[in-house]
């Protein structure tokens, strides 16, 4: 039996859980539930990330202590996760004695190993607020890509990390005043000491290929010292040999994975060392967002290695959530938090929809609300629940709830379902949830075809067909039960209801798909899932929009400039001259996956894209003038639309073998077109 420890990134105790966060927690929870369903020893650890200046300042603003604030947020987060059936084996806090002791141990062992350096630095200081400004309380322009309104430690657009003093046009995020530079003694982790070790670790299969490639870029730039200290006042752990200095939150936050495990082990009588002080007793997996890759795949394994702890077996990164093809937006009502969603809709709708779109890659996931309604209604209500709702009533009313004592002839369907289980299990294991859902729905289609072919509603009208009616319904319900076992990691609540329907003496396990139920008495069928109502989705969006703050009025000059810009663009947006159908059909539009993207040296607007057009058409190189709106990293793995038969064009930087389609007036307002989920590279757009 495998022993598996799984973590999700720790939610910060300064805000609500929203649908973007839930991508990761639902993805992780599905993976954990799958392993438990298979009989593996798998524990899921998480905690609130509680330290840092934002917590301290918010608590001051609300007139409470930081401890009171994080305790309040802990309760709220736990309730939100429970509402979406995210089931942690331990949900703890980084503001714990276990975390303090482990953080100190990691620091002291690295210090004693010569991996800590003390240096005097120039640091941003707000004279108005009389405090050194932490990274996240400085906003400005990224020194690498020029993106505006970025944090003082890392850029959300290009993922670069830097020191706050490197930020251009910096301002205090609290009061808006321009900070001054002031010297301060800080403690640095010598990351470059672990360069060789990290290169080997990264290439050992611990990361997805695209993430390993991204890390290679940072090695090419050279690893830098990492500032692990912050000046007081600060809510966090004081550094043992440095009064008035505190551990930076990114040192004690990942240590929270270990502290939560330790807390859990003490409660359960389990050996903590088997998980974190040796690597031959258990597997350790981290699920994270791609925006925190740097911390989890460079700093974290280096700190662990330097202090004698084991490193993760693998780190799985996922992309961001978009809604209707765009970033979550409060003004559009698509920045939806967990409580807003659950007030209107069944959380298992979202669990299934995310599962139906999640892959093992680092692709962004789009929550298309129209597709959401259609897919949930079609797949779960129309294909899965429909099997039980059409047949269970006949068994209860006509046969006192009893399935056939001997499983009937079913043309090999049950065996086919059982054999498909290994393929589905392999897809779950590899985090190819979308493919797993597709495989399950193909089975559901087969089961529904069986029902259509044998028409139990017709058999019920003929007294001479009573035995055949029981047989058809028994087969259908057994197929339904198998489908629900396959779906149990995704739909735990509905699976529990189905267990009650079948009078299951124990919760379903994966091995239950091996044999059909015979002679079992089932309970009366109870409604399992309603259709998604578009009206409720619209009401949810409207409620989220109403809670969004009113837009800040623009100065008259800015408004005038915007009007002039819109007027100039009107001519560009005028309808082009008509063409006939045959002319249009000469344009060969294809689905393409952006396999790679990088900046073009010497070009201000261009990105070089490597497009995958499937096995037949292979790859193409295309230069696209979209650099002002997208970083190269944002594009990797995305699907787009390309004009595939455009004649190659020789450019200064190389030959462009096509054109990707985009909308927008230009500048920073460019949006590449993406096909809906399910489209495959190379498919022609008609």
Curated annotation (Swiss-Prot):
The keyword Transmembrane does not apply. This is Methionine--tRNA ligase. Zn(2+) binds at residues 142, 145, 155, 158. It is found in: Cytoplasm. It comes from Magnetococcus marinus (strain ATCC BAA-1437 / JCM 17883 / MC-1). GO terms for cellular component: cytosol. Residues 543-572 are annotated as: Disordered. It comes from the Bacteria. Coiled coil: none annotated. Belongs to the class-I aminoacyl-tRNA synthetase family. MetG type 1 subfamily. One of its GO terms (biological process) is methionyl-tRNA aminoacylation. Homodimer. It is an enzyme of class 6 (ligase). A motif ('KMSKS' region) lies at residues 327-331. HAMAP family: Met_tRNA_synth_type1. Keywords: Aminoacyl-tRNA synthetase, ATP-binding, Cytoplasm, Ligase, Metal-binding, Nucleotide-binding, Protein biosynthesis, RNA-binding, tRNA-binding, Zinc.
């Amino acid at each position: 039996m495998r022993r598996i420890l799984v973590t999700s990134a720790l939610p910060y105790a300064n805000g609500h859980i929203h649908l973007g966060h839930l991508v990761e927690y639902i993805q992780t929870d599905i993976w954990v539930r799958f392993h438990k369903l298979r009989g593996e020893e798998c524990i899921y650890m998480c905690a609130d990330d509680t330290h840092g200046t934002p917590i301290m300042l918010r608590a001051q603003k609300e007139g409470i202590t930081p401890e009171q604030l994080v305790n309040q947020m802990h309760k709220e987060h736990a309730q939100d996760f429970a509402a979406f059936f995210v089931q942690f084996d331990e949900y703890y806090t980084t503001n714990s004695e276990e975390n303090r002791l482990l953080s100190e141990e990691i620091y002291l062992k690295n210090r004693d190993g010569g991996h800590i350096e003390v240096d005097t630095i120039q640091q941003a200081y707000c004279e108005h607020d009389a405090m050194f400004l932490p990274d996240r309380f400085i906003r400005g322009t990224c020194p690498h890509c020029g993106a505006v309104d970025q944090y003082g430690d890392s850029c959300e657009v290009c993922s670069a990390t830097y020191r706050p003093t490197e930020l251009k046009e910096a301002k205090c995020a609290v009061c808006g005043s321009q900070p001054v530079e002031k010297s301060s003694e800080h403690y640095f982790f010598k990351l470059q000491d672990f360069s060789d070790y990290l290169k080997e670790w990264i290439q050992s299969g611990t990361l997805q290929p695209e993430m390993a490639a991204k890390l290679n870029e940072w090695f090419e730039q050279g690893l830098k010292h990492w500032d692990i200290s912050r000046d007081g006042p600060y809510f966090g752990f004081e550094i043992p040999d440095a009064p008035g200095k505190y551990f930076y939150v990114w040192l004690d936050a990942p240590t929270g994975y270990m502290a939560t495990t330790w807390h859990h082990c003490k409660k359960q009588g389990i050996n903590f060392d088997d998980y974190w002080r040796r690597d031959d007793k258990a597997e350790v997996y981290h699920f994270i967002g791609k925006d925190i890759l740097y911390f989890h795949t460079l700093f974290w394994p280096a700190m662990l290695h330097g202090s004698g702890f084991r490193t993760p077996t693998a780190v799985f990164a996922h992309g961001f959530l978009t809604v209707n093809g765009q970033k979550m937006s409060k003004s559009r009502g698509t920045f939806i938090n967990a409580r807003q969603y659950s007030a209107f809709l069944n959380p298992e709708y979202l669990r299934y929809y995310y599962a139906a779109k999640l892959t093992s890659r680092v692709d962004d996931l789009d929550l298309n609300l129209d597709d959401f309604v259609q897919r949930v209604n079609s797949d779960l209500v129309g294909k899965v629940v429909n099997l039980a709702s059409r047949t269970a009533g006949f068994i209860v009313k006509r046969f006192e709830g009893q399935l056939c004592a001997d499983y009937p002839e079913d043309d090999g369907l049950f065996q086919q379902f059982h054999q498909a289980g290994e393929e589905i299990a392999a897809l779950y294991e590899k985090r190819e949830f979308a493919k797993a859902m597709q495989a399950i729905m193909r089975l559901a289609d087969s089961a529904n075809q069986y029902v259509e072919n044998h028409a139990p509603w017709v058999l019920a009208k003929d007294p001479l067909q009573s035995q055949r009616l029981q047989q058809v319904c028994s087969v259908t319900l057994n197929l339904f039960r198998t489908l629900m076992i396959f779906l149990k990691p995704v739909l735990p609540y509905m699976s529990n209801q189905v267990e009650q329907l079948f009078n299951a003496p124990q919760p379903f396990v994966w091995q239950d798909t091996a044999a059909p139920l015979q002679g079992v008495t089932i309970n009366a069928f109870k409604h399992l899932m309603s259709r998604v109502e578009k009206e409720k989705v619209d009401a949810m969006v409207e409620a989220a929009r109403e809670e969004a703050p009113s837009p800040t009025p623009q100065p008259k000059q800015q408004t005038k400039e915007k009007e002039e810009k819109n007027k100039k663009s009107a001519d560009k947006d005028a309808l082009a001259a008509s063409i006939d159908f045959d002319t249009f059909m000469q344009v060969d539009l294809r689905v393409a996956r952006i396999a790679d993207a990088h900046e073009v040296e010497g070009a201000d607007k261009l990105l070089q894209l490597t497009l995958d057009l499937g096995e037949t058409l292979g790859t193409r190189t295309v230069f696209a003038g979209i650099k002002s709106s997208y970083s190269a990293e944002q594009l990797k793995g995305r699907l787009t639309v390309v004009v595939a038969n455009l004649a190659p064009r020789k450019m200064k930087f190389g030959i462009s073998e096509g054109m990707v389609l985009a909308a927008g007036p230009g500048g920073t307002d460019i949006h590449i077109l993406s096909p809906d989920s399910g489209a495959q590279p190379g498919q022609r757009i008609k």
